[in-house]
Amino acid sequence: LNATDLSFTIDVDSEEVFNLGGRVELSGIKNGEIQAFNMAGSTSDKYGQIFGAPTDGSLKNINITGLDFGNLLAAVAMEDEQLLLAELQTGFGVTAVSIDGLVANIADLKAKLTSGKIEIADNVIENFSLTDFGFTDTDEEIALDIGKAQFKGLNLGFDFLSEKAVIENATQFYGLTEIGIYDVSYTIEGNEFGIDDLSLTDVALDSGFLVKSTLNANGIRIPIELIAEMDRSVARSIENFTDSESFTLSFSNSNDFNTEDGTYDVNLSLGVEGFAAIKINAAYAGLDFQRLRRVYKSEDFIEMMDGLSKIGEELSMSSVYFEYTDDQLADVILSQVPDVKQLVMMSDMQIDMFLSQYPDQADQLKASIKAFLEGTNTFKVSMNAEAEVKIMDIPDLFVSGDMTNSILVAFEGN
């Protein structure tokens, strides 16, 4: 079924006040199923005679594959909640949807979408994406722009009416393996919130545990004006540091738990524009996954705490890395110090006392701190175990003076 060059107009006093036009294509129609549905068109309601407000919009193309139209109509007509839910779980038979070039303007409301796609298979939304979405409410002074948004792996195949099923699937992230939103700008009354990149990827679960993931949150912008409403002095300090109308921070975290051999790697970074950034990487071993599962499932508090204690006793360190990178924070703080050389001398004395059994490491740390205070750039600490060292044994190793026989410690500053 093809209908092209469709057009419907309403004229008042020889003036066109409403127009609706476009095309519709249907193929593979059988037993209430439509194999393919394709549509494009535009509409204009100049004075709001039909839609209640001045409206104009256009759609370059929408394509739907595999729509089970019969069951959808039956569920709605019969008000059958179970049938409607069952059809929702299967996506009404739809396997793919694509939208291109959507524009809608209703009075002071404006929306646009360059493209959108959905792919569904076996009750799972395998891919959902939006590109170049925008919404504006000029009356409320609100504007939202999203460069790209996407997610993968959303599971629709469970009972939405069952609280237990909803909770169980929530612990499994509803099957999601990737979520991302990029180049976001939200402006209200002249104040802009922004996100360069907010994403969760590489998601893997085992028995309800998140054993692998990568979280990135980059370029999170918060307007200084909003902070000023809570604390003006803090807002002024931030503005002096950043010389910007926004407080911008970035955060990332990745973890990888090998449930077979008990190794656990974690990487964490946090940065604030105009201030500083830190990075922490750590590798652990001896993390008993089966014991962790039993602790997670235990409803006995004492049993749970005992299990956690045993896990802590067996947990070992392979390596730890810390890095501090300065932007302006150290410069500003040191500008308030009357005598930096005296600060270095006092620091040297404290280090000599604390690391009296480790003179080589003490000298390296003193040199690194001195270099950092002079360069105010980066300061790094690394600890690498020659063989896995139980974390609970580290304090005793340090006191004994034998720690460097098991763990290589290094400092660097510039």
PLM segments and residue spans:
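Glycine-rich, small/hydroxylated-residue low-complexity segments
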Residues: 1-414
